[in-house]
Amino acid sequence: MSIADIRTDYTQAKLSELDTDPDPVAQFAKWFGEALRAEVPEPNAMSVSTVAANGRPSSRILLIKDFDQRGFTWFTNYESRKGQELAQNPHAALLFHWIPLEREVRIEGRVERVSSAESEQYFQSRPVKSRLSALASSQSHPVADRTALEAQYAKVEAQYGEHPPRPEHWGGYRLKPDYIEFWQGRASRLHDRIVYSLDKEGKWQRHRLQP
């Protein structure tokens, strides 16, 4: 079988305007809850896409840690490639892909750092070894080899033990959405796409897109 012959026909569900909540965050909460109940592997995993000042895009998988009316929140190293790109261009796109449910959610908007207090609270809730890794790794920067990386970790572990502090370059981002699209796979590639976009008055407008 060639790659071109690999395909799946989606038949599980449908999505109409009447099925969706007027509030896209509430609609996301509904779908996220259904992904949890369906035991979708890592339902909180999302692709985060950023764009550098020269227009070159990059994407990576991260885990969302919170969402509410303020936006969608995750935590990372501010000195990483994504952190540097967000400093240059504070807009990003998120993508959740729940394969067992044949669903996707696309979210676009402006990104801001969360408060130091919020970053600190989440950092202290992480497992100790994850906190040590945040100190040991200069994310997205070159390292000689795995041995050198593990040596950096061992040094940090010896220094801080069970109480590693949050580095200043580590914290949270929150994306304030202005565009959210809910995609439900359908048969014959005639998929359902319901989009919410903010109008000039800051109100959500809902409409359907052709697949």
UniProtKB/Swiss-Prot annotation:
It catalyses: pyridoxamine 5'-phosphate + O2 + H2O = pyridoxal 5'-phosphate + H2O2 + NH4(+); pyridoxine 5'-phosphate + O2 = pyridoxal 5'-phosphate + H2O2. FMN binds at residues 60-65, 75-76, 81-82, 139-140, 183, 193. InterPro entries: Pyridox_Oxase (IPR000659), Pyridox_Oxase_CS (IPR019740), Pyridox_Oxase_N (IPR011576), Pyridoxamine_oxidase_dimer_C (IPR019576), Split_barrel_FMN-bd (IPR012349). Its EC number is 1.4.3.5. Coiled coil: none annotated. Its cofactor is FMN. Substrate binds at residues 7-10, 65, 122, 126, 130, 189-191. The keyword Lyase does not apply. Keywords: Flavoprotein, FMN, Oxidoreductase, Pyridoxine biosynthesis. PROSITE patterns: PYRIDOX_OXIDASE. GO terms for biological process: pyridoxine biosynthetic process. It is an enzyme of class 1 (oxidoreductase). Pathway: Cofactor metabolism; pyridoxal 5'-phosphate salvage; pyridoxal 5'-phosphate from pyridoxamine 5'-phosphate: step 1/1; Cofactor metabolism; pyridoxal 5'-phosphate salvage; pyridoxal 5'-phosphate from pyridoxine 5'-phosphate: step 1/1. GO terms for molecular function: FMN binding; pyridoxamine phosphate oxidase activity. Signal peptide: none annotated. Binds 1 FMN per subunit. SUPFAM superfamilies: FMN-binding split barrel. The keyword Oxidoreductase applies. Homodimer. PANTHER family: PYRIDOXINE-5'-PHOSPHATE OXIDASE (PTHR10851:SF0), PYRIDOXINE-5-PHOSPHATE OXIDASE (PTHR10851). Belongs to the pyridoxamine 5'-phosphate oxidase family. Catalyzes the oxidation of either pyridoxine 5'-phosphate (PNP) or pyridoxamine 5'-phosphate (PMP) into pyridoxal 5'-phosphate (PLP). This is Pyridoxine/pyridoxamine 5'-phosphate oxidase. It comes from Janthinobacterium sp. (strain Marseille). The gene is pdxH.
